[in-house]
Swiss-Prot record:
GO MF: transmembrane transporter activity
Record lineage: Bacteria, Pseudomonadati, Pseudomonadota, Gammaproteobacteria, Enterobacterales
Principal subcellular localisation of the protein: membrane
Gene: aaeA
SUPFAM superfamilies: HlyD-like secretion proteins (SSF111369)
Record organism: Escherichia coli O157:H7
Role description: Forms an efflux pump with AaeB.
Protein name per Swiss-Prot or TrEMBL: p-hydroxybenzoic acid efflux pump subunit AaeA
Amino acid sequence: MKTLIRKFSRTAITVVLVILAFIAIFNAWVYYTESPWTRDARFSADVVAIAPDVSGLITQVNVHNQLVKKGQVLFTIDQPRYQKALEEAQADVAYYQVLAQEKRQEAGRRNRLGVQAMSREEIDQANNVLQTVLHQLAKAQATRDLAKLDLERTVIRAPADGWVTNLNVYTGEFITRGSTAVALVKQNSFYVLAYMEETKLEGVRPGYRAEITPLGSNKVLKGTVDSVAAGVTNASSTRDDKGMATIDSNLEWVRLAQRVPVRIRLDNQQENIWPAGTTATVVVTGKQDRDESQDSFFRKMAHRLREFG
């Protein structure tokens, strides 16, 4: 009898332990697969592609992949050519100003004399000549202003505080108008784009708190969900040349969850030393930050599993 009871007790204990282990593993798996988190996240920032508005030879490069202030000179394009163009335009303006003054006096004199001294045709001709010269003066002034603007834009300045990166221009090179010369990563503009699976969006709302762990680091950054993308492209549906819908074949028992971009605003920009484009793990903790002291062993294990799973 004792042997039977002992055997039954061992069996019962084994069954209970197996059930508890199954429950723990199941809860950890559900937490791992359904809680709002992703390892498909990247640091991003506002990047300005800087291109000159004029063409010419680069005469001076002032910066090399460094932090710059707004208005700081990045590089300079050949100025003498644009200086000469401005001087020529200024000379044209001066010429037409003198000519306009002469024609204005001539037209005024003929208008005062009237038809008693000359024909109406001669009076109208003088007025028409004056209007033509005034029109030419206006064009010359516009050309002068444009030449002045071109000269000013031979000096390319930083549009904002930030880091100059991917600088690929050198002194002596010829650069064309509109060609990207350098990228400027704006300071204090860093954020995280987390690509959440659609099955996890239930726990993601603007204003929710988030934890960001950069790849290869144990440091946890804090942030707030700023926005959730309103839509993503349907890659399985296109249109043919007649406008008819084309739907790709799909296996009914295999459905891959779509990923939706979630923008997360970092709490402290100054602590961010990770370049834009680097990856991270993001966990959305809800309306408040996660209290690690309240986490169970399995919850902590699930958090660690996210880094490797």
